[in-house]
Amino acid sequence: FLNFNKLKNNLEAIPEKSDVIIDFSLCGFVDHSVMENVDDYQELFYKKGGNIEVIGLDVLGADSKHPFALRRLLPIHKILPDNKTKRQNNLSLIAENFDLAYQSTKSVDCLFLENFIYFKTKKIEHIFNELTEKSGRFRSFDVTFSEGEFIAKEVVRTTMLFIKTAKSAPAFTLDKEGLLERLYALAGYEDIDIESHKDFSNRFYLRGENPKEIRSFFTNELVRFFESNAYYHIESNKDGILISNKERIASIKEVKALLDFGIRLNNAINETSNEAISH
């Protein structure tokens, strides 16, 4: 509550027709007055054509089913099992729309992430809010991990998508910002240019162990797919493909976009693989 004035001032400065995301995942608790005030702002923005989505409450527990109940970090056994947040209820609806299974509870079954270079310097704690295709080929999830030790330790929560591709893909990373370039360089990944696509090579950081294999994998169709779609950080290894965007929990709109992107990327990979076989 003490920090609500700062949040209020920020909300007052934003045009009411805007799309806004409020992330409470780093808060120790959120009291009922904050919940009520945020709800009022959500209604105001909605009437003006905007939207406010609240994320991060699913990492906090409540000992009441009231929608504005105080939420705080609670021991697992004290969290009401059916006391889902609005985001979790919306994830259940996404599961129905995409024909997926939804599991909101925490799981330490994270071995499928261990071989990705992205996590080499990170300690994975658990995944939660998992959306899984019945065949197990697609897994969207929120993940909590930490970097550093002691006072330098930083806890991060983000949303990712894992795809177990039908056709094996070479080990590579595709990144637009180059923020993780040093990490992948230390892993022995080389900078790779796609010679027939200079614009693509200028816009994206493509790295990998086997340039020849990667250039063969990045067909004209696959390059055009990446050029014409929203940007995501992508890492491929022998286990599958890991896709992420921002280092925070994704909004419902962003989860839908991530799933849609992943499904279409998998289709594009399968199509290019089939074309390569036919030739």
Features from the language model and the residues they span:
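Cytosolic C-terminal regulatory domains/tails of membrane transporters and channels
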Residues: 1-87
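Charged, low-complexity intrinsically disordered regions
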Residues: 84-279
